[in-house]
């Protein structure tokens, strides 16, 4: 089935915020009798939010992170342009007040500066034809369907680092790829790729569902058929970002495409930023990404993209390209194996269920919140806030 990407979104999230973000049970400190040790696998958004909640409640924990840095699919670059660029998650996918909710801060106005993201200079591609979408159609679209924000002079990585790493980073053990999780005994024993063993009373697995689908972690006992099927039924598509710097802006705010699965969009990365640079991004996920992969390496993909843009804009892409580009291929990253959760066919009960109340799962895939009880935000799987809230929720499950 073909899908239409009106502008680059990691996932569409509707938001109906009419009140201030207040404290609620999802982020309040929890009284508990649990005094054991916990190991978190993965230092992405959900792993760090789980760690923050454990730390607030005085629970001993460690984080095993496979890579040499924290953040998971939330990363940034500060050298490519005159503003910081999100290499992974980029859009907030909700009203800006969700940022306060995530850190248990009252009020609708976050401390960080944001951009109301409503591009109106949008072109659409169908087959070989590119057409301009009427500005009023885009205005009506934003009025009727979606509120979207981005960070102005910062990134998702900055938000995560500033709010979820204080006194936590010292508990992260980097370059520790978990290969085996043995939950057959009283303690859960984890083995890493360097042969080290760690044990804990409980384990929270926050690796991407793409990693689980790839079977790079061995569970002892083996996962049930129901659990395996639930994981394999999650749609977790490959994809990449290609960021290119030009001497002039010859392109609109957004170029959207029809795709068989996932999405494909070009977008002005500098939209609303305090920038003198001209940076165009290509977000390609699903079927379009797989077609690009067939071309070969990043340079082959770049040349194909420039040729495509030249066809739309009379050769201006190649003429104004400065030679600088970033290719962030999340679909083939060793520790992610994909982009984000776009669809789930399986029962969320099988997907979210712990293993013998010893091994728990958290991340953007496992969100079960729906509409938040306080500010009316509708949180779908696949967003950063889904990952953060999942980390909070799994700690509640353990401590209660």
Role assignments for model-derived ranges:
Residues 208-251:
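Glycine-rich loop(s) and the adjacent beta-strand/alpha-helix scaffold that form part
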Residues 39-41, 64, 198-212:
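Short hydrophobic core segments
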Residues 92-120:
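N-terminal FAD cofactor-binding segment of flavoenzymes
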Residues 55-80:
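Glycine-rich FAD pyrophosphate-binding loop
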Residues 36-63, 395:
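N-terminal Rossmann-like FAD-binding beta1-loop-alpha1 element of flavoenzymes
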Residues 46-49, 135-142, 187, 264, ...:
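Conserved flavin/dinucleotide-binding core of flavoenzymes
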Residues 13-38:
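Bacterial Sec-dependent N-terminal signal peptides
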Residues 145-189, 198-201:
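Helical element adjacent to the flavin cofactor pocket in flavoenzyme catalytic cores
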């Amino acid at each position: 089935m073909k899908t239409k990407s009106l502008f680059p979104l990691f996932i569409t999230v509707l938001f109906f915020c009419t009140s201030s973000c207040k404290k609620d049970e999802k982020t309040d400190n929890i009284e508990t009798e649990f005094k054991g040790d916990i190991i978190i696998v993965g230092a992405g958004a959900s792993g760090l939010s789980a760690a923050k909640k454990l730390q607030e409640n005085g629970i001993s924990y460690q984080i095993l992170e496979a890579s040499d840095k924290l953040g998971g699919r939330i990363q940034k670059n500060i050298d490519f342009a005159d503003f910081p660029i999100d290499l992974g998650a980029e859009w907030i996918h909700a009203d800006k007040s969700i940022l306060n909710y995530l850190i248990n801060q009252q009020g609708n106005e976050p401390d960080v500066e944001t951009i109301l993201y409503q591009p109106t200079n949008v072109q659409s591609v169908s087959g070989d034809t590119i057409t301009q979408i009427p500005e009023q159609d885009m205005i009506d679209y934003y009025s009727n369907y979606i509120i979207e924000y981005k960070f102005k002079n910062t990134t998702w990585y900055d938000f995560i680092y500033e709010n979820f790493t204080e006194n936590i980073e010292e508990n992260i053990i980097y370059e520790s790829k978990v290969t085996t999780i043995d939950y057959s005994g009283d303690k859960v024993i984890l083995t890493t790729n360097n042969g080290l063993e760690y044990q804990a009373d409980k384990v929270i697995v926050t690796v991407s569902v793409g990693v689980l689908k790839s079977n790079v972690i061995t569970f002892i006992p083996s996962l049930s058929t129901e659990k395996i099927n639930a994981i394999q039924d999650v749609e977790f598509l490959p994809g990449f970002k290609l960021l290119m710097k030009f001497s002039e802006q010859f392109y609109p705010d957004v170029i959207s495409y029809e795709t068989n699965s996932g999405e494909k969009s070009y977008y002005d990365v500098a939209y609303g930023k305090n920038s003198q640079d001209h940076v165009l991004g290509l977000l390609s996920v699903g079927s379009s990404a797989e077609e690009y992969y067939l071309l070969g390496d990043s340079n082959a993909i770049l040349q194909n993209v420039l040729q495509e843009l030249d066809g739309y804009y009379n050769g201006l892409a190649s003429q104004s390209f400065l030679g600088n580009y970033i290719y962030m291929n999340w679909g083939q990253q060793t520790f992610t194996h994909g982009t984000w959760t776009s669809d789930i066919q399986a029962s969320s009960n099988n997907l979210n269920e712990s293993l013998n109340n010893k091994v728990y799962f958290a991340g953007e895939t496992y969100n079960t919140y729906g509409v938040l009880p306080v500010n009316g935000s509708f949180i779908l799987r696949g967003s950063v806030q889904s990952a953060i809230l999942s980390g909070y929720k799994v700690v509640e499950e353990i401590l209660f």
